């Protein structure tokens, strides 16, 4: 089982943790500019969020349009995730489905991997993880394609950068119970958390 080896944040790179052959950011991304310095629009209005998603325009927002717990980061739509200007810091990228599967396998798979990925605090009583990996996943919830917010403090949703043949993408989810890491197709106009990955 690949337990994580932590590295602190610097001015150039996020805090990270090495798990198996991968290096992952140790917190949800919270940048509001692309790597080239261009601003990513903050879109608080529900109608404007829906319009941005339909048009493929990048957007970000804090869960609930308000201050959130430390480590939650911000929620991005898929256009921000895949924008060629780059969402993750230099040397990192948004993971694809294979990266997520590799991470899960390095931690033993199934419920064991899920518990290792979840933070030891910040979840409802009795459902926190062990955080043995150092990944520290938190239940930052998601924003629907219509602009509503759901399941903050209950579920963690993470983007992958792959787009499916039917136009959707795959979300990777950790629940407020003992279920394993879960994958589900979601609309690209959703708002979800982002982690970044690099070779170890």
What are these regions, as identified by a protein language model?
Residues 1-10:
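N-terminal export signals
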Residues 11-200:
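Conserved positions within compact, well-structured domain cores
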């Amino acid at each position: 089982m690949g337990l994580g080896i932590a590295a602190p944040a610097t001015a150039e790179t996020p805090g990270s943790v090495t798990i198996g052959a991968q290096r992952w950011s140790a917190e949800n991304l919270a940048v509001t500019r692309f790597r080239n310095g261009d601003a990513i629009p903050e879109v608080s209005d529900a109608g404007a969020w829906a319009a941005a998603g339909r048009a493929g325009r990048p957007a970000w927002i804090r869960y609930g349009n308000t201050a959130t717990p430390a480590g939650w980061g911000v929620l991005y739509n898929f256009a921000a995730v895949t924008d060629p200007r780059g969402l993750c810091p230099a040397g990192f990228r948004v993971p694809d489905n294979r990266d997520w599967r590799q991470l899960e396998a390095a931690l033993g798979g199934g419920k064991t991997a899920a518990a290792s990925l979840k933070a030891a605090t910040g979840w409802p009583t009795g459902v926190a993880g062990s955080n043995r990996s150092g990944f520290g996943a938190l239940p930052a919830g998601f924003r629907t394609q219509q602009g509503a917010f759901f399941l903050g403090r209950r579920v963690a949703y993470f983007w992958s950068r792959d787009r499916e043949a039917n136009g959707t993408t795959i979300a990777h989810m950790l629940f407020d119970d003992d279920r394993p890491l879960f994958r589900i197709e979601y609309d690209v106009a959703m708002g979800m958390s982002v982690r970044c990955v690099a070779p170890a």
